[in-house]
Amino acid sequence: MNEEMKMTQEREGRILEAAIDTWGSEMQIVVAIEEMSELTKALTKYIRADDAATISVSIREEMADVGIMLNQLSLIFGDTTEEEIRKLNRLRR
């Protein structure tokens, strides 16, 4: 991993930890639920919509929000690497 990427990840970690410290774990869990709901809504619109290009932008924005919140949830509940490996191994079968 290059030095710039490592610095970016460290900075992101500090930002995420600051958000948890400022608003608390419980509130960040609520925000994660809200962001996942917004992604669900955007995906549903994509399936039903005629203007897929516009909805695709919204989906990418919501995916970014959910990704950030998943990173915060990892800080709150712990790393999911082992679970992800198990799930990927099951998919491979």
Describe the predicted segments one by one:
Residues 1-93:
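Flexible "arm" and connector segments at domain edges
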